[in-house]
C-alpha cells in the first residue's frame, strides 16, 4: 500500500484531535509534520492543544506554530463549540512536549520545495498558513500533490447562514487557496455533518480502549453538549477526521467535481463557498466536493486507529 505523505495543518479543536490521532497511526498515512494555525481558539491555545494530544498519544511528529491572525479580517474564535481552551473536556498531564522553533509557513515551503511533488497538504482549520505559504513562495504550487481540506459547504453554513467557520475565519486566505490551481478536495459541512458522534459511537470507542479511546470519549462527550446547544445535533460531527478518512480510502466518500469560488465581499455571504453544483457558470471544476460518506466504514476506520494506540507488552 502506498503511504500518502501529508502535512496536517490544524487548529485543535476537538475534531482536529481525532484527525491527529488517525493520521499519526494509520499505515496508509505518512504524517511528516503538524502545523498549527489560529482558528477554533487563539494560536497560543491551539498550539498547546496540539502538543497535549501528541504527548498523550506519544506521537513523535514535529509540531510547528504558524499564523496567529487571519490575513485581513478581525480574528474570530469558536469558543461556543470548543470552549475556553479550544479543547475543553479532557484533562492532560503537565505539558513537557515543545514545538519546533521554525515557523509553520517556512516549514511548509521548505518541505515542499525539497520534495518530489508527492506531499499532500491537509488543512482542517482556517487556511491562513497555506495561503501565506503560497504567496511567500509561489514555486510551491506545482509541488503540492493535492490539498484535502475541511471547510465550506455547498448548502448552509454553521457560523453564519452562508459560511462555515474555517472559511469565515479567513475568507481571503481561502480565496487564495481556491484560486491557486492546485488540485483540491473539499470536505464541507454537507458531508461532515453526516459524522455525528452519538453516545453509542462514544461507547464503542471506550470499549475499544487504550489512551486514544479514553481521549476520544473525553473529547466527544464535551461536544455532545455544545453541538446540541448550538445546533440541535445529537452529537459532535468529527468534521476534520473525514479528510483523513478520504486519504486512507477515497472510495468511502462520494465526491462531485464542481467549480468553487469563495465570496470575499462584505455582506451576508462573506466567507461562503459558492459551489456550482449544476455547472450553470460553465467554468471548469476546480474542486472535488464531498457529498456522502459511508458512516459504517468511517466509524470502523476510527475504531481501527483507536485500537492502534493500545500497548501490547
Curated annotation (Swiss-Prot):
Ca(2+) binds at residues 11, 16, 124, 240. Disulfide bonds: none annotated. Substrate binds at residues 227, 239. Pfam families: IU_nuc_hydro. Keywords: Calcium, Glycosidase, Hydrolase, Metal-binding. One of its GO terms (biological process) is pyrimidine ribonucleoside catabolic process. Hydrolyzes cytidine or uridine to ribose and cytosine or uracil, respectively. Has a clear preference for cytidine over uridine. Strictly specific for ribonucleosides. Belongs to the IUNH family. RihB subfamily. This is Pyrimidine-specific ribonucleoside hydrolase RihB. It comes from Shigella sonnei (strain Ss046).
Amino acid at each position: 500500500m502506498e503511504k500518502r505523505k501529508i502535512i496536517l495543518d490544524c487548529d485543535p479543536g476537538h475534531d482536529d484531535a481525532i484527525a491527529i490521532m488517525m493520521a499519526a497511526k494509520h499505515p496508509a498515512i505518512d504524517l511528516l509534520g503538524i502545523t498549527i494555525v489560529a482558528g477554533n481558539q487563539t494560536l497560543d491555545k491551539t498550539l498547546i492543544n496540539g502538543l497535549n494530544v501528541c504527548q498523550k498519544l506519544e506521537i513523535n511528529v514535529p509540531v510547528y506554530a504558524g499564523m496567529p491572525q487571519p490575513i485581513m479580517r478581525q480574528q474570530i474564535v469558536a469558543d461556543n463549540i470548543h470552549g475556553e481552551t479550544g479543547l475543553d473536556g479532557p484533562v492532560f498531564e503537565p505539558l513537557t512536549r515543545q514545538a519546533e522553533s521554525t515557523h509553520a509557513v517556512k516549514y511548509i515551503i521548505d518541505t515542499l520545495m525539497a520534495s518530489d511533488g508527492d506531499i499532500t497538504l491537509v488543512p482542517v482549520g482556517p487556511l491562513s498558513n497555506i495561503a501565506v505559504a503560497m504567496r511567500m513562495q509561489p514555486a510551491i504550487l506545482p509541488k503540492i500533490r493535492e490539498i484535502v481540506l475541511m471547510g465550506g459547504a455547498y448548502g448552509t453554513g454553521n457560523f453564519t447562514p452562508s459560511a462555515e467557520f474555517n472559511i469565515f475565519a479567513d475568507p481571503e486566505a481561502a480565496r487564495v487557496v481556491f484560486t491557486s490551481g492546485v488540485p483540491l478536495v473539499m470536505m464541507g459541512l454537507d458531508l461532515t455533518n453526516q459524522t455525528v458522534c452519538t453516545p453509542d459511537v462514544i461507547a464503542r470507542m471506550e470499549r475499544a480502549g487504550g489512551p486514544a479511546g479514553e481521549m476520544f470519549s473525553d473529547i466527544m462527550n464535551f461536544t455532545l453538549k455544545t453541538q446540541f446547544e448550538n445546533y440541535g445535533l445529537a452529537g459532535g460531527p468529527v468534521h476534520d477526521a473525514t479528510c483523513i478518512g478520504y486519504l486512507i480510502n477515497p472510495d468511502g466518500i462520494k465526491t462531485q467535481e464542481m467549480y468553487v469560488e469563495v465570496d470575499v465581499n462584505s455582506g451576508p455571504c462573506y466567507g461562503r463557498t459558492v459551489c456550482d453544483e449544476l455547472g450553470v457558470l460553465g467554468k471548469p471544476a476546480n474542486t472535488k466536493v464531498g457529498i456522502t460518506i459511508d458512516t459504517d466504514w468511517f466509524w470502523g476506520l476510527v475504531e481501527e486507529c483507536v485500537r492502534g494506540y493500545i500497548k501490547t507488552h
